[in-house]
Amino acid sequence: MSPRRLAWLAAFALIAASCGGGSSSPSSPSTPTTPTTPTTPTPPATSACSAIGGVAGTIQGITNGTSCSLATSAVVKLNMKDSGGQTVGGCSGTVIDRRAVLTAAHCLVGEVSSVQVFQGTGATIASASFSAHPSYSHTSSGSSGLDIGVVITATDLDRTPVPLLFSRDARVGEQAVVAGWGQDENGSSSGLLKAGTTSISNVASTWLEAAASMTSVNVCSGDSGGPLLLSEGGAWALGGVTSATSGGAYCNSGTSYFANLRHPDAQSFISRLVPGLTSK
């Protein structure tokens, strides 16, 4: 089954061994890097919320996925509007500066004329501008290029920005935290922010991959643009952006794909648009 893009259905939920959504496939990754023994211990599912700046809440029918407090997390929900003000899609994103959100390129192309940022509480914040990486291209047969984009907001975001991991490659076998607002394994969009853990199964120049298992989470419709976090120097940093999955209708199998922020073209694109970002 071809990997599917994860935009639409309003948000990014991170799910446990069961969610995968979207449409079309990323281009074939380049040769994987040599596996390296990971040094980061597996964070328990209940600690995943703290990795994204939230507080763990009740598990809402998601295997290994924990619902998180909305009041403090840097993982936000994006609603895309067309020129007539109609909603044309929904994604997740991560606050990386006081007025900047990192998300997926495929969330920002097509009919999108404006973006509304919802922090989980309070009013939405309008975009001042948004940009998809210029290398990104999508056709009926698949997509290519770096699936990353940046939303610049009109006013400050009330969240602590997440640093980006620019200094090293992800490692095969390394544990990671993913989070978002999308569908769960029952095909339900609960409107909850969720987080959980997974493991890196492949590393390529433009893509990171994580295979679904009974002990890991998987991503689903609405999860596009959300973070893949890696531990560095005792803190969590943004190493990838959720892009696509090869999972089935209930997001319970296959491989999830994340744009690799280690790629120099990704780093130069983000740094140009967000000169004040913090990296590790």
What is each of the regions a protein language model found here?
Residues 82-84, 106-110, 121-123, 154-159, ...:
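Acidic glycine-/aspartate-rich tracts in secreted/extracellular proteins
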Residues 56-70, 109, 113-159, 165-168, ...:
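Conserved catalytic-core segment of clan PA serine endopeptidases
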Residues 144-218, 222, 232, 253-257, ...:
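Chymotrypsin/trypsin-fold serine protease catalytic domain
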Residues 44-86:
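N-terminal activation segment of mature serine protease catalytic domains
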Residues 1-17:
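Sec-dependent bacterial lipoprotein signal peptides
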Residues 76-79, 113-123, 174-180, 230:
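Short conserved beta-strand and strand-loop elements enriched in small hydrophobics
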Residues 19-35, 43, 48-51, 56, ...:
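C-terminal subregion of chymotrypsin/trypsin-like serine protease catalytic domains
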Residues 75-98, 143:
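A conserved glycine-rich beta-strand in the N-terminal activation segment of trypsin-fold
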